[in-house]
Every structure is written in C-alpha cells, then in structure tokens.
C-alpha cells in the first residue's frame, strides 16, 4: 500500500489505522511524505517512510512508492481515504487474470457510507471526468464488475511491474488527472481495468481536486489534448465545455487565470498529442504478466 501525503498530514493517522487494522498479513506499507512527520507511535520499521519534501505531487509520490515497493500489485491510497475490512483480499481476487492491469475500488462517501461517492470514473471525451453512480444509495443497488473504468481520486490497484515498464506516472500532470492518465496508459498497452464492488474505500469529497484556477485549467487542457481523437465533433464538444467552464470561472474571480491556464495547456500539448508510444513496450510487459498477447482495445473509458 502506497500512501501519498500531499498537504494532508493531519489525516495520516486515520488512514494508517484503517490499513493496519484491515490489511492482509505481510502487507508492505509505504508512506510518501511532503513534510516532516514525528512518528509518535514508533511505526518506523513496520512502515517505510519516504521523505520527499515540499512540493510533492501525486505523480511523484506514485513513482517513488512504486520503486520502493516489492509486490506484484500496489494499492495507491491517497492520505485521508480509509479502507474497509477485506478490501485488499477482495480486490486481489482479480490478480491472476492476466488481462487486468488496474483494479478500481468502490468509493463510498465517508460522511454517509450508505451513499456511493464513485463506482469508478468515466471520461467524457469533451474533456471531463465523470463520477459514476455518484449519490446512489447502496441499499438495493447491485453493482457489476464493470470493466474499462477509471479510478476515483481515492486510488486504485496497479500491476507494479507493468506500471514501471510504462515509465511510471507523468509528473507533469496535476493531481486530478494522474490516475486517469496512468489507467489510460494501461489501456493503450492492451490491459483492462475492473471495478470491484466489494473492495470498499471511504472517501471524503473535500479531498477531491476542484478549481478553476490557472493550474487546474492548464492540467485539464493538457490531458484533453493528450488523449483527444482530434475529430471535429470532439473539438466542438470541447469548445462547448470550455465556454461553460469559462463562464463558471467568472463569478469566482478566476476568469483570466482560467483562460491563461487553458492556453498554456493547449500550447504545451496540442502539437504532440499522445506523447508515449507503447508499441515497443508490449513484449516487455508480456514478460512480466503472461505468455500471450494482451487483447486489442480502444483506450478511452466512456462516461455513463
């Protein structure tokens, strides 16, 4: 389990308690810190602390933790989120399926655990991440093992060797897009993801990345152009989304930072599009997972 602490240190001990209480035997726990931690309970030794320093972002934390880990699978669990009993065992029931590279937990609302915060995420190719089944009551709801779903911001399980072969997380991306980008890289390499409804994480909506400021707008635009199919209809839908979000930024006093961020993201990514070519990675990845070629698949997870 890799726990990144990015401006969330006061919540660390709650996350650790849930992991240590419900974690399987011999579970390796790695905490990547953005500020000093006094370790008042003397957990050093039982837990690996990586002191990455100020300015840490989720992508950097994922890469540091992944290199320090030793297991076949890692669970990237941002600090402030809490796991439930048997969460890891239920997720890793999929571990032997060579087609699966990402396992997505069901995230429930920590304020009301009878409500779904996200049964994974979808991606609207106009440039927007969409919470799946947000606000739906768990009572009377049957959740399937939905495939090709993106992770919520509360984290996911990844095949560690495959993630390393893909080059890790892109540290130029903002926190709100890192897990989606990593998962889409898995899709491009021929793997799928799966939602495991019995792997439950309690997430706080207050921890979800939001905003209309410069950085948020830049990161959103950069992600769009990285994964866009460049079709005319897609561009038109994206322009409609930009218009709506620009108008929404106006009453928040973020109009010009938002516009500047969008322009910066476009300049940085529009000319290059998909920056990673995974054609040379397939054989290396297969050596880590199976003797057969992974299935071909389009790589955009649809919303809805």
Language model regions located:
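Glycine-rich, basic loop-to-helix element that forms the pyrophosphate-binding segment
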Residues: 52-69, 79
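Short aromatic/hydrophobic "clamp" motif used to bind/position activated sugar donors
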Residues: 74
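Non-catalytic, C-terminal membrane-associated alpha-helical segments of glycosyltransferases
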Residues: 214-216, 229-304
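Active-site donor/metal-binding and catalytic loop motifs
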Residues: 189-192, 196-211, 219-223
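Short, acidic, metal-binding catalytic loop of nucleotide-sugar glycosyltransferases
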Residues: 17-26
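Short, flexible, basic/aromatic active-site loop/helix in glycosyltransferases
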Residues: 124-149, 153
């Amino acid at each position: 389990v890799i726990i990144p602490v990015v401006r969330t240190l006061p919540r660390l001990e709650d996350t650790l308690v849930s992991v240590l209480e419900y974690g399987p035997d011999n579970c390796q726990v790695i905490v990547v810190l953005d500020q000093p931690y006094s370790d008042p309970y003397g957990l050093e030794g039982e837990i690996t602390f990586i002191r990455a320093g100020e300015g840490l972002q989720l992508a950097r934390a994922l890469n540091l933790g992944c290199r320090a880990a030793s297991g076949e699978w890692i669970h990237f669990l941002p600090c402030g989120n809490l796991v439930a009993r048997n969460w890891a065992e239920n997720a890793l029931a999929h571990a032997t399926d060579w087609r699966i590279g990402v396992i997505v937990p069901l995230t429930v609302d920590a304020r009301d655990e009878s409500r779904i915060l996200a049964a994974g995420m979808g991606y609207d190719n106009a440039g927007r991440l969409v919470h799946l089944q947000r606000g739906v009551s768990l009572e009377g709801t049957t959740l399937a093992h939905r495939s090709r779903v993106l992770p919520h911001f509360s984290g996911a399980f990844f095949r560690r060797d495959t993630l390393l072969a893909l080059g890790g997380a892109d540290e130029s991306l903002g926190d709100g897009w890192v897990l989606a980008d990593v998962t889409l890289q898995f899709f491009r390499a021929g793997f799928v993801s799966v939602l495991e409804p019995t792997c439950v994480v309690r997430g706080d909506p207050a921890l979800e990345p939001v905003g209309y400021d410069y950085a948020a707008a830049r990161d959103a635009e950069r992600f769009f152009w990285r994964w866009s199919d460049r079709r005319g209809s897609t561009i038109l839908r994206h322009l409609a989304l930009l218009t709506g979000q620009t108008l929404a930024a106006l009453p928040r006093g973020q109009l010009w930072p938002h516009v500047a961020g969008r322009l910066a993201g476009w300049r940085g990514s529009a000319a290059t599009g998909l920056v990673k070519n995974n054609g040379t990675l397939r054989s290396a990845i297969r050596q880590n997972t199976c003797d057969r070629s992974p299935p071909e698949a389009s790589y955009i997870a649809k919303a809805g």
